[in-house]
């Protein structure tokens, strides 16, 4: 039998449920139920005894599952759960439990910075040298250079530097950047009081909240990715992924890959949002961001056709492909309406919305949910969310009702998935995909949104349960955030942490999580066919389809912990 708890802990007033799980014996019989569960202080004093309640068979894990609720324990302290001779990892009950985690999740972004030296006073033992400062070239010219048709000096060179390394590689991708930024900037917009922390970054103390200073580093890189006509390069990468070397040792040619309409629309959206967010702190940047957004929106109007992106056959870096840009265009139109107040953007947004079947997603593959956040902003911001909405025209008011209904309908659908899970996770068995933890956290953001819109505790409890899953209530028995919990994963697929020669792992990385269809050689070799999807996980750095990290897996965790940290 195994006992699964949130290894970080539980708020004094939150829902608290321990999961007990067993697999069937060789005969296939249902295991014998655990008789009792004891909630004890870490020094072994039993404080509460409960009889577990049988949930049933959990298909995603292949386990027979029991639950024991111990929500009546409120006293701050350190605890363990016992059942017969099995003991859980220690955990805390109290207040402020997510504060340090929220900080480490946010500080991860600093450790992803490209184009600058990370100094010991900010990075500690993870200090490293400046990287990727050489000029970039256009793919259209570089492929001619590779074919011997032109010389190096015949290519245009672009001094584009900065931003965050996207993931375990050293590429930087426009659509992924926009999505990660949107998660974080909206988290700041909706839960600003949770972002009063000093992240100990070079900009700390400059009069701007540290999280906004960190995001500004990425935004300033993204501004450089816009061409003279308003198009936006899809990505800035080398031809192929770097070897597992430190960033400054990756000296291969950086390439600007062609403009995609997804990148242009995402760029227009995030710059319009940034203009609103940064106006109180940096008027000049806010103005620059809005002008850039308008320029890219004009580009979209001049190019109504879908312009996708596919990797050239010579390239193996992240593709971030798509089959439509309608959701991206929707997001761009809505952000520009919210920033400028000009009704034609709202009209554009409603026309695009009416073409879509899915409207509540927050990932790079579908950004439609961000349009809903922009539209419903006054209903989600703390200073206005408790007041009657004051929309300026009938179209906006009616559209807001529709989007509110969309969010709540999707939240209720997710609640139904959670009820069917022995581990209270918002994934059906077939949804344990590459980056499954991103899906968990994106849905936690939607549940958080539903709570603010509708003030029903069931949504807050469900969002909390998703962090329980991420932090240890899962059949792999890991906390999926480095440095968070007694059994946190330690070996991300990340070039820096493998090449730096340091035994400790940078804290605050979110793992991609279990993948029912492993897609890397190591995982395919080690995970046996028929393994239940929730158990298709290995804490091995080579397993990039299970254990990579990326900015847009951290960003929904930043949002969710900001929501859970408010007034706690």
Mark where each language-model region is:
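Aromatic (Trp/Tyr) and acidic
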Residues: 7-84, 89, 95-99, 107-178, ...
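Flexible, small-residue-rich helix->loop connector segments that border functional cores
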Residues: 190-192
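Short, glycine/acidic-rich hinge or "gate" loops at secondary-structure transitions
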Residues: 195-202, 233
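Acidic, glycine-anchored loop motifs typical of Ca2+
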Residues: 203, 207
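Carboxylate/His-rich catalytic cores and anion/metal-binding grooves
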Residues: 208-231
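Proline-centered turn/helix-capping motifs that create local helix->coil transitions or kinks
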Residues: 226-236, 304-309, 341-344, 416-420
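Hydrophobic, small-residue-rich alpha-helical packing segments that form membrane-like cores
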Residues: 294-298, 302-305
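Zinc-dependent metallopeptidase catalytic helix centered on the HExxH motif
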Residues: 361-363
């Amino acid at each position: 039998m195994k006992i699964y708890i949130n290894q970080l802990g539980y708020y004094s007033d939150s829902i608290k449920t321990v999961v007990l799980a067993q697999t069937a014996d060789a005969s296939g019989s249902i295991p014998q139920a655990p008789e009792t569960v004891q909630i004890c202080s870490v020094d072994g004093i039993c404080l509460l005894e409960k009889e577990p309640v049988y949930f049933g068979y959990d298909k995603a894990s292949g386990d027979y599952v029991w639950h024991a609720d111990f929500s009546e324990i409120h006293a701050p302290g350190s605890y363990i759960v016992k059942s017969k001779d099995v003991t859980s990892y220690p955990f805390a009950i109290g207040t402020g439990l997510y504060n340090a985690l929220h900080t480490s999740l946010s500080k991860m972004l600093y450790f992803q910075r490209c184009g600058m030296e990370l100094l010991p006073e900010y990075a500690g033992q993870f200090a490293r040298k400046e990287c990727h400062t050489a000029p970039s070239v256009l793919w259209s010219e570089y492929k001619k250079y590779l074919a011997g048709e032109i010389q190096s000096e015949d290519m245009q060179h672009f001094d584009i530097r900065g931003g965050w390394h996207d993931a375990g590689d050293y590429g930087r991708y426009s659509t992924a950047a926009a999505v990660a930024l949107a998660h974080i900037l909206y988290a700041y917009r909706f839960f600003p009081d949770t972002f009063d922390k000093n992240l100990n970054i070079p900009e700390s103390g400059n009069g701007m909240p540290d999280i906004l200073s960190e995001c500004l580093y990425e935004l300033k890189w993204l501004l450089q990715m816009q061409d003279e006509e308003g198009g936006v390069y899809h990505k800035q990468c080398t031809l192929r992924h770097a070897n597992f070397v430190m960033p400054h040792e990756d000296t291969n040619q950086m390439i600007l890959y062609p403009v995609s309409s997804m990148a242009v629309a995402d760029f227009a959206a995030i710059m319009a949002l940034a203009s609103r967010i940064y106006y109180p702190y940096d008027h000049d940047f806010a103005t620059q961001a809005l002008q850039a957004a308008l320029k890219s929106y004009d580009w979209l109007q001049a190019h109504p056709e879908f312009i996708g992106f596919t990797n050239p056959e010579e390239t193996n870096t992240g593709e971030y492909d798509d089959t439509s840009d309608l959701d991206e265009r929707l997001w761009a139109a809505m952000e520009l309406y919210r920033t400028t107040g000009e009704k034609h953007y709202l009209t554009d947004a409603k026309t695009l919305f009416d073409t879509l079947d899915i409207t509540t997603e927050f990932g790079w593959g579908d950004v439609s949910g961000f349009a809903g956040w922009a539209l419903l902003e006054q209903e989600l911001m703390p200073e206005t969310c408790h007041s009657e909405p004051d929309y300026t025209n009938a179209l906006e008011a009616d559209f807001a009702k529709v989007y509110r209904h969309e969010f709540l309908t999707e939240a209720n659908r997710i609640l139904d998935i959670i009820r069917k899970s022995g581990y209270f996770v918002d994934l059906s068995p077939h949804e344990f995909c590459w980056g499954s933890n991103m899906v968990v956290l994106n849905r936690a953001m939607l549940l958080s949104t539903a709570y603010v819109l509708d003030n029903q505790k069931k949504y807050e409890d469900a969002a909390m349960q998703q962090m329980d899953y991420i932090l240890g209530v899962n059949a792999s028995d890991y906390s999926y955030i480095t440095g968070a919990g007694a059994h946190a994963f330690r070996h991300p697929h990340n070039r820096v942490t493998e090449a730096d020669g340091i035994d400790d792992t940078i804290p605050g990385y979110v793992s991609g999580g279990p993948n029912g269809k492993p897609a890397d050689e190591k995982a395919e070799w080690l995970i046996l066919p028929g393994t239940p999807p929730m158990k298709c996980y290995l804490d091995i750095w080579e397993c990039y389809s299970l254990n990579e990290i990326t900015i847009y897996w951290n960003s929904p965790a930043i949002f969710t912990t900001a929501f859970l940290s408010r007034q706690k």
